[in-house]
Swiss-Prot record:
Disulfide bonds: none annotated. Its cofactor is dipyrromethane. This is Porphobilinogen deaminase. One of its GO terms (biological process) is protoporphyrinogen IX biosynthetic process. Its EC number is 2.5.1.61. One of its GO terms (cellular component) is cytoplasm. InterPro entries: HemC, Porphobilin_deaminase_cofac_BS, Porphobilin_deaminase_N, Porphobilinogen_deaminase_C, Porphobilinogen_deaminase_C_sf. The lineage of its organism: Bacteria, Pseudomonadati, Myxococcota, Polyangia, Polyangiales. Monomer.
Length: 300
C-alpha cells in the first residue's frame, strides 16, 4: 500500500477546492497516507476568449492532467467527470467516482428575479449548448449569449451588468462556498443536468493496482452506477460539447431511472427519452441501459 502519492489538479479555484476536499477525505480514510499536489494549467484554461466548441471541446480540460499521469509526474488526477470524454487513453482508467454533489443547475440573477420573472429580452450567459436549449425551451423570449471564464468571472459579469443572469452548476457554487449566490435552483424538468454533473472522476494509470485500491476507498456505488449509465448515453450518441446532450440517472426506490435528451447543435429536433431498470447489480447493466437509451435518441 503506497504511503505517498501525488495528485494532479487544474489550477482554478473550483478545481483546487474539489481536489483538496477529495484529498482530505482520502487521507482521513487511509491511515498513514500523505498526498502532494501538482497544479497543472490545461489547454482549456489557457484559452478563455473562444467557445469550447471552437477550440476542441471539453477534453482540453484533462489533456495535460493525463500527460502528467502518463509521464509519472502524478499518480492520480481529480476531474469534474463531466469534462471527461467517453473514451480515455487505454493506459488510464477511472479508478473512483466518489459520492456526488447536487447535480442541478443554478440561475444567478442580478435583480433576484426567478427564471419565470426575467423580463423579455433579458440577457442570460451560458456557453453550454445544453443549457441554452433548456433556457430557450422554458423562455424563448430571452437572449442567450456565450460566456467563458471561471465561476468568479461569470458571477462578476452579472453583477457588473454585462448579463442579467448566468446559469452555473450548483455543485460548483457549493464547493466554493457560494451557494447563497444562487437565485433559483433549476429542476431537472426545466434543465436536465449535464452527464456526470456534480460528480468527480479520479483517474490513474490502469497498471497501478495499489493506487487503484487506495482510490477505490472513496468510490460510491450508487453514484458510480448512475454516472456509468449517463456516460453510456454520451458514448452512444457520440456526444461532445458541440452536441446539446444531457442525461441524468437517479435511484428511485428499487429502480434506476434514467432520463436523457438530445438536440441538433442549433437546438432543433429536441427529443427526450427515459427508461427504468430494476436497480442493477453492476455498472455493465447500467451501461447497457444508457447505451440503449442513447441509441433510441440517436435514431430519433
Amino acid at each position: 500500500m503506497p504511503t505517498e502519492l501525488t495528485l494532479a489538479t487544474r489550477r482554478s479555484a473550483l478545481a483546487l477546492a474539489q481536489s483538496r476536499a477529495f484529498a482530505r477525505s482520502l487521507e482521513a480514510a487511509v491511515p498513514d497516507l500523505s498526498l502532494r499536489e501538482l497544479e497543472v494549467v490545461t489547454s482549456g484554461d489557457k484559452t478563455q476568449d473562444r467557445s469550447l466548441q471552437d477550440i476542441g471541446g471539453k477534453g482540453l480540460f484533462i489533456k495535460e492532467l493525463e500527460e502528467a499521469l502518463l509521464d509519472r509526474r502524478a499518480d492520480f488526477a481529480v476531474h469534474s467527470i463531466k469534462d471527461v470524454p467517453a473514451e480515455i487513453a487505454p493506459a488510464l482508467c477511472l479508478a473512483c467516482i466518489p459520492a456526488r454533489e447536487d447535480p442541478r443547475d443554478a440561475l444567478v440573477t442580478r435583480s433576484g428575479a426567478l427564471l419565470a420573472e426575467l423580463p423579455a429580452g433579458a440577457r442570460v450567459g451560458t456557453s453550454s449548448l445544453r443549457r441554452a436549449v433548456a433556457l430557450r425551451e422554458a423562455r424563448p423570449d430571452l437572449v442567450i449569449e456565450p460566456v467563458r471564464g471561471n465561476v468568479d468571472t461569470r458571477l462578476r459579469k452579472v453583477f457588473d451588468g454585462v448579463f442579467d443572469a448566468v446559469v452555473l452548476a450548483l455543485a460548483g457554487l457549493k464547493r466554493l462556498g457560494l451557494e447563497a449566490r444562487a437565485t433559483e435552483v433549476l429542476s431537472p424538468e426545466v434543465s436536465l443536468p449535464a452527464i456526470g454533473q456534480g460528480a468527480l472522476g479520479i483517474e490513474c494509470r490502469t497498471a497501478d493496482d495499489s493506487v487503484r485500491d487506495v482510490l477505490g476507498t472513496l468510490a460510491d456505488a450508487e453514484t458510480t452506477i448512475c454516472v456509468s449509465a449517463e456516460r453510456a448515453v454520451m458514448a452512444a450518441v457520440e456526444g461532445s460539447c458541440r452536441t446539446p446532450v444531457a442525461a441524468y440517472a437517479v435511484r428511485d426506490g428499487g429502480a434506476l431511472w434514467l432520463r436523457a435528451l438530445l438536440a441538433e447543435p442549433d437546438g432543433s429536433r429536441l427529443r427526450r427519452a427515459e427508461r427504468r431498470l430494476s436497480w442493477p447489480g453492476n455498472t455493465r447493466e447500467a451501461e447497457r441501459l444508457g447505451a440503449d437509451l442513447g441509441a433510441e435518441l440517436k435514431k430519433g
